[in-house]
């Protein structure tokens, strides 16, 4: 079941404010998601084998941030009807009546187009086209096509959130390779455990909005089993940079420890057999997943700077 697109956002929200605030527009950008996008893109750009002019590097990261923000605004524009239904999202600017759908759409389109044009004009067109494809994938493939149709929405659509380190890499090198693809795979495999653990303690919200998340469609047991499965795949991918010699021993040790802890949480979630235990472990798994991804990419960055210092 999905909420009809014809459903007026105003039907469950306040009247549109005459003057949206700067904060309202910032909220449209999904700033917390943008931080993750910017950080992983920055790591991809810095650890690539080619040094980029700092000014062009700054422009590249700015374009990725602006493009990600534009995509976030377009996502909120399209999902305004279901955002109005969900407790977690009904205070967003459009369902709350702070910004009109039309303004949000124009805002998102302008940011998305500008980010691609500036990236292409000042950095390189390969990275710009990669950025354009990522925005398209997030809005059209994930938001419009998959999100309301299949419980695999997160698995396939998660690619959009995994592309930023490859875009950062492409901004510096003008191409992509196996190392950048490994960075993509880490985030791609991380996405299902992250979002499905969230959906386990937010299933009523998703059910009310008619979004076919895994717990609502396949059930709690299947969801927990798949969280464990994808966590193991993610751990294997996280070991990849060390295995191929892209990352050193420092990364290898710490990424292994972090992956074991993540698998431990996912295993305990899978074995939980009461409602309270499931909710508790789902929350622990979700919040650890946030730390895990930041730590994995942070370790890569720290190790890179340590090696630079040693070489100098």
UniProtKB/Swiss-Prot annotation:
Function summary: Converts heme B (protoheme IX) to heme O by substitution of the vinyl group on carbon 2 of heme B porphyrin ring with a hydroxyethyl farnesyl side group.
Record key words, sorted: Cell inner membrane, Cell membrane, Heme biosynthesis, Membrane, Transferase, Transmembrane, Transmembrane helix
Name this protein carries in UniProt: Protoheme IX farnesyltransferase
Taxonomy, superkingdom: Bacteria
Main localisation: membrane
Pfam families in the record: UbiA
Subcellular location(s) of the protein: Cell inner membrane
GO process annotations (BP): heme O biosynthetic process
GO molecular function: protoheme IX farnesyltransferase activity
Transmembrane segments: 33-53, 54-74, 105-125, 126-146, 154-174, 181-201, 243-263, 291-311
Membrane topology recorded in Swiss-Prot or TrEMBL: Multi-pass membrane protein
Cellular component, GO, one term: plasma membrane
Reaction catalysed by this enzyme: heme b + (2E,6E)-farnesyl diphosphate + H2O = Fe(II)-heme o + diphosphate
Broad enzyme group: transferase
CDD domains reported in the protein's UniProt record: PT_UbiA_Cox10
Pathway as given in its UniProt record: Porphyrin-containing compound metabolism; heme O biosynthesis; heme O from protoheme: step 1/1
Gene, per the UniProt record: ctaB
Annotated signal sequence range: none
EC number: 2.5.1.141
Family, per entry: Belongs to the UbiA prenyltransferase family. Protoheme IX farnesyltransferase subfamily.
Note: Carbon 2 of the heme B porphyrin ring is defined according to the Fischer nomenclature.
